[in-house]
């Protein structure tokens, strides 16, 4: 049960974050959120959740799929991207990509558990002696990925890297739950690093 509980709460963990010490452009007013790889449905879900999490009254975020529809494994035309950024006046772009995705399978051996004996009564003794619980071994599969998120200012023609965050992400039950946890971790760090203002309560 302990193993199952640990798996249930395991989730994305921030490995590192970096903020450009030379950046002094202030808060962003219009941010484009772009997920580079993965299935289209998962990209859209990630973009939607991150947009909702980082949008503020002082600056709003937008999912890229509202402007660029990409089937799976379709690259982005950089000329189109430049035109989009210029036409829509985006002052920042958040780019997320999965840099590593591994599936590991390990064997978790069974365990024998016996409650401490209680000899005061027959029923106590009997119930303590016989309910020896055996948990059979099982194969445990974990999907582990690394997600890199970069935020660029568009003030310069080729963009300027302002912030980077890298997470190790453990799939927790479903893709949707994993995305939700990932977005929460990223948003917390973006606030901590003063890239976006804290959410008003």
Question: For each of these PLM feature ranges, what is it?
Answer:
Residues 16-21, 46-56, 119-123, 193-197:
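Short low-complexity stretches enriched in small and charged residues
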Residues 56-60, 86-90, 118-123, 172-178, ...:
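Glycine-rich loops and low-complexity Gly/Arg-rich segments
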Residues 75-151:
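Surface-exposed short loop/turn segments
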Residues 9-29, 130, 134-201:
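C-terminal/domain-edge helix-coil "capping" segments
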